[in-house]
A protein has these predicted regions:
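Hydrophobic cores of alpha-helical transmembrane segments in multi-pass integral membrane proteins
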Residues: 2-9, 15-41, 47-48, 53-115, ...
């Protein structure tokens, strides 16, 4: 039955497509970072520190999204007994933890000029710290 899907052709197509998509992704990231961090004008109130938000907010969204994926994959594993879902969830944890750490660091860098201190025990900051602890516990 596997011969019906022509795995050699599909794998060669994926290899070529993967290379093209990597080149497109890297070029889009470079153009986006240049536009966000260099050509973006300073904010009237926050000045140049607003540029940190172009990295901080997406990394927070990705960290929370990865955690949501881990939760959904883990629940689906318990219900449907699909054997690849725990592997996908386990491989998503380091990615989410890196983005969570980037979110905490960039949030602290933004907080220093804005609030005058690197860390405030705000609910959002504390929840990202707890999320990082959850990630590290899940990885361990």
């Amino acid at each position: 039955m596997l011969k019906n899907f022509f795995p050699n052709k599909i794998l060669s197509l994926n290899k070529n497509l993967f290379t093209v998509l990597i080149v497109i992704m890297i070029s889009v990231i470079i153009v986006g970072l240049i536009n966000a961090l260099i050509t973006s004008p300073p904010d009237a109130v926050q000045g140049n520190s607003v540029r940190i938000m172009y990295v901080h907010v997406p990394s927070s969204f990705i960290a929370i999204g990865c955690f949501g994926f881990i939760g959904i994959a883990s629940i689906a594993t318990l219900i449907f007994k699909i054997k690849i879902l725990p592997l996908m969830a386990k491989s998503m944890a380091p990615v989410g933890s890196v983005f969570c750490l980037v979110s905490i660091v960039t949030g602290s860098l933004w907080g220093k000029p804005t609030w005058g201190i690197f860390w405030v025990w705000d609910a959002r900051l504390t929840s990202m710290l707890i999320l990082l602890i959850f990630y590290l516990a899940y990885i361990a």
